[in-house]
């Protein structure tokens, strides 16, 4: 892999096995990326998607991590990085005729939200 030095400037929150498909979550994450903390919460509150609630909980958790662990002010925070990855599929079976069963794959995803301070970025 080489020598990769990762410097974590902000705080992050990770949501695992969120029961939403990646494409549905991606349209929400693309909307809040590079927004301020308050603006992201307002956008998530008024967007008409079911997947907004887990993302808003992650933004609140990342802000709490930033204020408690790093001592950053919540008014200076913004969403610096946000991404979605595939996770496991929940496998279920639908009963069909003559004793058969058809598999159903219910997708899940991993969501990562990273908040940074505006004063650190400048």
From Swiss-Prot:
GO terms for biological process: translation. GO terms for cellular component: chloroplast; large ribosomal subunit. The keyword Chloroplast applies. The keyword Oxidoreductase does not apply. Its main location: plastid. Belongs to the universal ribosomal protein uL22 family. This protein binds specifically to 23S rRNA. The globular domain of the protein is located near the polypeptide exit tunnel on the outside of the subunit, while an extended beta-hairpin is found that lines the wall of the exit tunnel in the center of the 70S ribosome. This is Large ribosomal subunit protein uL22c. It comes from Adiantum capillus-veneris (Maidenhair fern). The lineage of its organism: Eukaryota, Viridiplantae, Streptophyta, Embryophyta, Tracheophyta. The gene is rpl22.
């Amino acid at each position: 892999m080489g020598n990769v030095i990762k410097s974590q400037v902000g705080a992050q929150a990770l949501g695992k096995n969120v029961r939403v498909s990646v494409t549905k979550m991606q349209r929400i994450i693309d909307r809040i990326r590079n927004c301020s903390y308050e603006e992201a919460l307002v956008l998530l509150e008024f967007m008409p998607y079911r997947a907004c609630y887990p993302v808003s909980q992650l933004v609140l958790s990342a802000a709490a991590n930033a204020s408690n662990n790093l001592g950053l002010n919540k008014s200076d925070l913004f969403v610096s990085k946000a991404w979605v990855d595939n996770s496991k599929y929940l496998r279920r079976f639908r009963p069909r005729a003559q004793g058969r069963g058809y598999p159903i794959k219910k997708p899940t995803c991993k969501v990562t939200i990273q908040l940074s301070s505006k004063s650190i970025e400048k």
